[in-house]
Amino acid sequence: MLSYDYENALKVGEISLEDINKVDFANAYSNLMEKLDNGVVGFRDVIYDENLDKYKSLNGYENVVVIGMGGSILGTMAIYYAISPFNNNAYFIDNSDPEKTLSILKKVDLNESIIYIISKSGNTLETLVNYYLIKKRIEKLNSFKGKLVFITNGGKLKREAEKNNYDIFSIPENVPGRFSVFTAVGLAPLYSLGVDISKILEGAREMDKICQNEDILKNPALLNGVIHYLYDKRGKDISVIMSYVESLKYFGDWYKQLIGESLGKNKHGITPLLSIGAKDQHSLLQLYMDGKKDKIITFMVAKKYRLDEEIEFEDINDEKISCRYSDIIRSQQKATEIALTNNGVPNVRITLDEINEMAMGALLYMYEMQVGFMGELYNINAYNQPAVEEEKKICWRLIKQ
């Protein structure tokens, strides 16, 4: 599925295995396991849900439209675009930008679509407004032959679904939105999109076994969490995902929410950023190499690219070179890794055997566990987001003026 290499995080000389062992990670481990065992947080329980038959009525539609914000949609996008980067029957409406939303609705035949309305609270402003845009268009049809599915626990959207007898799936109350990709939030639309959701859960379960290991060097979620925690304490509080697989771009968006919203509490927090190699070597690498030394880089690489071929070309000295196309980006990644390490920039590497359902299930679950461990290290609640509530109240007030 995947492997984790932390050698360069130590090689730059700012932290050592001794420093890692000085961190009270055993307490962080036991505290998180207690919360998972007692159901205080439920993101582990949901990966063992065997009842996937409930999604069987959700396929057979030409288009899949998903409406949601943040944790209600980013995990689905991360997995779908990683696994199916060249398919175009998915439409994700994840903003209140009129140009984006209305351009999608202009080209989608709703009669040939299954439409997901996803909001745990049922009151998310953007999701509510975008649902009403859909509703207006459906009401103008002579008959609606598509399907509306609501994934919500309450609020205005649940009342709408019940009033109109639409299908409703719920989300476990102990699973925050940004941890909900392995619930109906992610599994239902992914099933409609033809993704093998059983393999996603299988990958998450395999990673869960690994994350049960109390030996930190054999537990990538715990080890990566401790390494980032230590570097944060040393002033490196910007965590950059640098993916050399472009289809993982949306994983980076999911990662930004997971890290930012979970750990940005009580004056703590790591700032998550996303770079795509090799193209960002021509924009951001100068900053990473020669700018402020306040970053730790996580390289994302694949052992195998799904599309590849033999190529021949001439270099700048007219010398012929023969190689696989993928050898180019592999060499660029390795060169960047070596150069950053030589310049004292700590980095780790996650290698996915192949970009498939199992690997993505494992990857997302590893990061959920990592954030759970880091919440314990910082002694914060990684599962709420109290600071954003103020903006929501102000926004509703402005809209009603």
From Swiss-Prot:
Swiss-Prot/TrEMBL catalytic activity: alpha-D-glucose 6-phosphate = beta-D-fructose 6-phosphate
Cited SUPFAM superfamilies: SIS domain
Enzyme superclass (EC): isomerase
Alphabetized GO MF terms: carbohydrate derivative binding; glucose-6-phosphate isomerase activity; monosaccharide binding
pH dependence: Optimum pH is 6.3. 50% remaining activity is observed at pH 5.3 and pH 7.
Cellular location(s): Cytoplasm
GO cellular component: cytosol
One biological process term in Gene Ontology: glycolytic process
Record-linked HAMAP family: G6P_isomerase (MF_00473)
Self-association and partners: Homodimer.
Annotated function: Catalyzes the isomerization of glucose-6-P to fructose-6-P.
Listed PANTHER family: GLUCOSE-6-PHOSPHATE ISOMERASE (PTHR11469:SF1)
UniProt-recorded name of the protein: Glucose-6-phosphate isomerase
Organism in which the protein naturally occurs: Methanocaldococcus jannaschii (strain ATCC 43067 / DSM 2661 / JAL-1 / JCM 10045 / NBRC 100440)
Lineage: Archaea, Methanobacteriati, Methanobacteriota, Methanomada group, Methanococci
